[in-house]
Amino acid sequence: LKPPDRKSSSDSPDTEISPVLLFQTLQGFLPEFIQRMLVVASENATLTKSSFPQKLEDADHSERVVEFATPSYLEALLEQNSYAKYDAILFCPDTERPFDFVPYVHIISKALTPQGWIFWVTRSEPCSADLLDRLNDVNMELYVIWDAMPSSLVASPQPFSWVRRTRQDEIKGDPVLFHCLAFVPKNYDPLAHARALLLDGAPGPAFNVLTFVPEVYLENPPVRAAVKAEQALCLLAWDQAASDGLTLPRFHLAQAFFAQATAADPHCHLAYCVQAEFWHRLGDDYMAARTLRSIQHVAPQETTATQLNTYTSHPAVPTKPWEPPEWNEGTSLPRILLITDNRPNYGLDVLYAGLFRVLGADHVLEFPHKPTLHGGQPERFADYPCCFCLPGEAVTLEQVCDELRSGRFDLLLFGDVERTLEREQALQVVRAADRIPVFLLDMLDDFRDNRPEVCDWLQLKHFAGYFKREMLTCVSYGNGVFPLPFAYPEERMPTSFPEDRPYLLFWAGQRQFGIRKLALEYLERRFNVDFSTRYTQAEYVSILQSSHIGLDFSGFGFDTVRYWEVPAHGAMLLAERRPTCIPFDFTDGESAVFFDDIPDLEKKLLYYGTHKEETIAIAHRGYDHVKRYHTATLRAKHLLGWIAQTMR
């Protein structure tokens, strides 16, 4: 895989470089696979092994060796009859005059291992024709470029900070102090390198190698899929070798790579196989088998079939039934402060609207002020049905803290799990709320337990309770954790429906996550349909209300807006069965229809496409079910019921 020849230019101010400081800053990006390294520095440089980053010698899987040489000694060193080859050779700049790397290219390439890298720190033009020609003569090529940016441009305690270029031909508009260039053999294959490290029992360095793959390589979809799937495989191998209880965080990261791999190539079997094995490690063989049955139905492979046969197919049972206690208003209503984020957030915003309706304007306040809750229009996410016209004025941080200290609020809901609020502001709010319970409200696309990280950020010992949208049925999250999926704003639910629904099946949306792309492309071929049409929000609602069946897949978060939106608009929900806890969920075949995998989806489409009366009846019951259990107001009452139970 060869990127096109590219050239770039950059201004390099004449800034003195300390080799010791250089070494200290290099530790942020040197590849972890390096076991033996030669450092070449000028005669005038004060350089010792102790200057080099300790991480090269403290890695778990092997000892690192760092050797030093001056340019005048280099050729003699490499002409010795026997010496161990190096994983990397680093050329440092002279502090007094330009260091010419080019004359040494012909002698150092033979001192490298087959996967070895050369690093060169220079103020010179990164892609000069002379350099590229000399590299070509010894079968080396430019791989990665880092630019040293002044600390005035990049927040750093050092005088400069390294910034990796997204592309080799990227032109920096800001001044660049100097560059670090990485060169590799022309036949260098990062996937083969990573797999060799993985088979050698080093999943961390294997994963690290893949983080350096240049973006230009990843523009090829099959290559991107292979790299992302291999990164997920490294995480799986890492998890299999560990016993630290961190399977859930690793799976969360692996799921992101699964989404990227299958978006680039929906037939990438390795991505599905790794995803399935992570489900198995969490104790959910049912999800593991479902994942593999989908890819096997579309593009069967023998090795995938072998893995599929190792899984049992029994659905995971929730650790306990989830039915929120009924909330009774009583004589006094709780006064709630909700700490929210600074952009439209469907889960938080719909819940706020529900709390507003249940408690009234005097009993619920958001901070910071979010205009989209009060008639403002967002620049992004405008198509999500979570904009409201509720009364409310902006308040300052000082006002919020004063009201907390004066006892205006009975509890605090912290919903900014992404921590968009400045930390010092968040700490001021939490300190002012030291006499009331603090609950964590986690509406992210994230099935990890985020309590420890947010507790640490807020300097809290614990939360009074944890409300979580993405709560896997196969995982025990401990006490004080309650499932709180999305809901649907009741004012957006139509009260009448068209007599004629001319469309059988509706889908519109992103294809990136889960089995979406695999399934949609299969259905388009199988039924000669097209799901690529894009709609305005008004067109979207109109066509959804004119369709008998609304199709829904899990996203990066398993809970989706469409899961509630489809039945709320009177269409039959045909949805991928969720692996998450959903109180008062739809009943399969009664108020919705669930499918486990692509063959199951195909079978149910064929059936309900020819049984319109059943489809209509299920759609009506689904609409009634949303109105009975899953409106914004009802979700707010579920939350309040659990809070009341917790605070007794």
Language model: regions and residue ranges:
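A short glycine-rich, Lys/Arg-flanked "PGG" loop and its adjoining helix->strand segment in the class I
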Residues: 102-114
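Conserved beta-strand signature within the Rossmann-like core of class I S-adenosyl-L-methionine
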Residues: 115-123
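Residue-level recognition of tetratricopeptide repeat
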Residues: 220, 224, 268, 301-302
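A charged, aromatic-enriched C-terminal amphipathic alpha-helix characteristic of glycosyltransferases
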Residues: 315-326, 613-643
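Nucleotide-sugar donor-binding catalytic core of glycosyltransferases
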Residues: 327-588, 594, 633, 637, ...
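Conserved acidic donor-binding segment of nucleotide-sugar-dependent glycosyltransferases
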Residues: 592-598, 608-612
